[in-house]
Amino acid sequence: MQPNDITFFQRFQNDILAGRKTITIRDASESHFKAGDMLRVGRFEDDGYFCTIEVTGTSTVTLDTLNEKHAQQENMSLDELKRVIAEIYPNQTQFYVIDFKCL
């Protein structure tokens, strides 16, 4: 069985599969992905594979520069997005946006 390249919390699986979540915001440890990469996607909780995505672009962002477009691409409100990012990555301010499409 092939290993997964990237994982998402299970609560995001349906939004990814339905095309409602089209970006992910990660820390420096996952800043190496680039446009054109095909990634096997698994659930964080059990590493179970659930789809393949294509990276369509990357950019950098800070907690302060997150905006409504980012929130829309994450399928949540801006306040919720900032809260989730702060919970997942406490004490960090620089992040990497990975734009993707589900294949």
UniProtKB/Swiss-Prot annotation:
EC class (word): hydrolase
Record's keyword terms, sorted: Hydrolase
The keyword Hydrolase is annotated on this UniProt entry: yes
Domain ASCH, first and last residues per copy: 6-94
Keyword Translocase found: no
InterPro entries named in the record: AC4CH, ASCH_domain, PUA-like_sf
Gene Ontology MF: a single term: hydrolase activity, acting on carbon-nitrogen (but not peptide) bonds, in linear amidines
Residue numbers annotated as active site: K21, T24, E74
CDD domains given in the database record: ASCH_yqfb_like (cd06552)
EC number(s) on file: 3.5.1.135
Domain of life: Bacteria
GO cellular component, one term: cytosol
Family according to the record: Belongs to the N(4)-acetylcytidine amidohydrolase family.
Name by which UniProt lists this protein: N(4)-acetylcytidine amidohydrolase
Originating organism: Salmonella schwarzengrund (strain CVM19633)
